[in-house]
Amino acid sequence: MTLFFLTCLLAVFPVVSMKSPIFGPPEIDSVEGTSTSIKCYYPPTSVNRHSRKYWCRQGPKGQCITLISSNGYVSKDYEGRANLTNFPESGTFVVNVDHLIQGDSGSYKCGVGINNRGLSFDVRLRVVPGSGVLNGTQVYAEDLGGKVSISCPFTSANLPNVKSVCKQIADKHCVRVIDSAGYKEPSYEGRAKLIIQGTTQTEFFFIIDQLQVEDDGKYVCQAGDDSSGDKSNVDLHVLKPEPELVYADLGSSVRFDCALGPEVVNVAKFLCQKNKEKTCNLVANTLGQRNQTFKGRILSQNNNGVFSVDITNLRKEDAGLYLCGANSDGQPQKSRPIQAWQLFVNEETTFPSRPSVVKGVVGGSVAVLCPYNPKEVNSVKSWCRWEDTQNGGCPLLVQSTGLVKNQYEQYNGRLVLYDEPGNGTYTVILNQLTAQDAGFYWCLTNGDIHWRSTVELKIVEGQPNLKVPKTVNVELGETVQLTCHSPCKFYSYKKFWCKWTDQGCSALPSQDEGSGQAVVNCDQNSQLINLTLKQVTKGDEGWYWCGVKEGLQYKETVAVYVAVKEKGTGSGALSSVRAAPAEDVIETSVRKVDRKVVQDPRLFVDTQAKDPEDAAGGSIASADPGSSAGQGGSSKVVVSTLVPLALVLALGVLVVGVLRARHRKNVDRISIRSYRTDISMSDFENSRDFGANDNMGASPVSQETTLGGKDEFIATTENTVETEEPKKAKRSSKEEADMAYTAFLLQANNMAANIQDGPSKA
């Protein structure tokens, strides 16, 4: 059962073999008697550099027989004509074989370690005879894209007869290609012809221009159509050019330099990639056309007849054969001259990974991490914007030396490059984003081109996380505090302020680092980062950035412009200015009001119901301690009100004490829970209608109040389910005491009102 289950799994999920990181030439065509050189690449790890390198030939049973290895072994077939050299610093080894014979044709492997263990690459070697006559057959060996002129002899008896050439196919059937009567096979149209020189010559020539791979094969020249016709056999070998090997890591960059010679210096050049259908898809040409598959990842230039193409952010599908040629319309065709490259993309890469897309919001910022070769610490780092135009290009925006001058107007206060020597990366920060900033950007250095990279910036909907005022105006000599608000998710991040210039953004010292003209401090509770500029001068004018970092990696930034103005005459108001986001100021003030208890004497004095106009007018004005009327009569009102009220309260306390002592034995034990609240005397009016509650506004379920800036919450619960109809309550001594206390409060309230009316009427 288990075996059946595993079989089903293998049927649904086929085994995926890991691609070998060893790379070499897939095909080699050579002529007999010449020599060949096979170059193989391997990942330059410490283990691979010291491991055995070998060149072996595959046998009919799948075994690979070693011919030569780096351990010093050389087979009998290779003695005296082969050698193997290892280049560990570049991760390559080269096998040279001299005095090639046709018997050397076959399938081989170049590898690292032990034969048949997977760390190898398959190579096919074809050795063809040189041009000449071999066993009565004329042999021609010409390069792909070249030209061949085949001589076809015949006897004088066939001078008046038709001359023709046919090509043999697999079943030994000969298909006519061309004849002297005017016929020409379509695939040879425009590039093949017959030349018959005079009427006395016993030889005609079959000429093929722009040789193609399909032209390789056996031909028959014939003069006359019957059995008496003259025939001659021809063997044509079209030699494929050995492509230049290009070994690159996944995510890195490559460059193809196409130099086809002075004869086509003014002809349009093209670069194409061979696909599985054996057609060549255009990558780019000198006419400005580019394949959309490489959008944002390709740069090309044509200088002095050399067509250079850079491809960055390499993908697995970028591997393959690339051809460069010349054609008037810039489209790929089988032409000569031609250059070829075989690109291998190593998926077991040590190249630093990074996002190919970064997203930002309007008004926000992005931080792009760019890799460079750690061995080139002193190289000039740059950042450019890729242009999707016919001429293409990538104009520089910023370098490690500062902002590019012709970009100052568009990127003033917005762009900076942080060079971080030693860790192999540099950071580019762009803030105050707009929708027009979307596009592709390239990370460049003037060193190793393989470390170039590109990133796509997308603008999405959203709001910036950091908030500052856009502009702050301050007068000379004043002190200004810039406030930057950050969300709680940045709580553990390092916050900073810096002053932007076209040379970079210089960090300002923190409060712990010493006092100076600019001091930074951060209030973690309110998530505010404050920058204080003391005694502002004209030199303080400019852009200031607030930002956050996670470790050594920059995250988000926001910019504010400080404008310094001359001191106004007679202004003399504030000696310091505080600039903060408006919404933060509102939230802070509201929070403070909510927690503040306003003690208004009016609550304890004037509590009788009044006309709305009087309540909105005179009473509020008189209660304002800041008004002149309130200050003028405050002392008289206090004396005339508080003294009689104190006497009445003392008398009331005495009466209540006597009554309670008198009925103490009959009074039930009462547990009183105290609470604090603000009470006005009007709360005691009609107290009997409310069950003599001391606080009419209090909820029967819960009571909450704020006093002295602290919150106290008291919750009380009662049983709302009536289980038995209550009997008519018998009035107890406790109730009599409560009624007496209520009557006293009502009387005190009336006395206080009469006393207040007296001074007001006076």
From Swiss-Prot:
The keyword Magnesium does not apply. N-glycosylated. Carries predominantly biantennary complex type glycans which are largely non-fucosylated. Sialylation with NeuAc is common, except for Asn-291 which carries exclusively high mannose glycans. N-glycans attached to Asn-83: Gal2GlcNAc2Man3GlcNAc2; Gal2GlcNAc2Man3GlcNAc2(Fuc); Gal1GlcNAc1Man4GlcNAc2(Fuc); Gal1GlcNAc1Man3GlcNAc2; Gal1GlcNAc1Man4GlcNAc2 and NeuAc1Gal2GlcNAc2Man3GlcNAc2. N-glycans attached to Asn-135: Gal2GlcNAc2Man3GlcNAc2; Gal1GlcNAc1Man3GlcNAc2 and NeuAc1Gal2GlcNAc2Man3GlcNAc2. N-glycans attached to Asn-291: Man5-8GlcNAc2. The chain crosses the membrane at residues 637-659. Residues 604-634 are annotated as: Disordered. GO terms for molecular function: transmembrane signaling receptor activity. Disulfide bonds join 40-110, 56-64, 152-221, 258-324, 272-280, 370-443, 384-394, 484-546, 488-522, 498-505. GO terms for cellular component: extracellular region; plasma membrane. InterPro entries: CD300_family_receptors, Ig-like_dom, Ig-like_dom_sf, Ig-like_fold, Ig_sub, Ig_V-set. Keywords: Cell membrane, Disulfide bond, Glycoprotein, Immunoglobulin domain, Membrane, Secreted, Signal, Transmembrane, Transmembrane helix, Transport. Glycans are attached at residues 83, 135, 291, 423, 530. Pfam families: V-set. Residues 19-636 are extracellular. SUPFAM superfamilies: Immunoglobulin (SSF48726). Residues 660-762 are cytoplasmic. Residues 19-120, 145-238, 251-351, 363-460, 464-563 form the Ig-like V-type domain. Residues 1-18 form the signal peptide. Interacts (mainly via CDR1-like domain) with dimeric IgA. Interacts (mainly via CDR2-like domain) with pentameric IgM. The Ig-like V-type 1/D1 domain contains three complementarity determining region-like loops CDR1-3, which mediate interaction with IgA and IgM. PANTHER family: POLYMERIC IMMUNOGLOBULIN RECEPTOR, POLYMERIC-IMMUNOGLOBULIN RECEPTOR. This is Polymeric immunoglobulin receptor. It comes from Equus asinus.
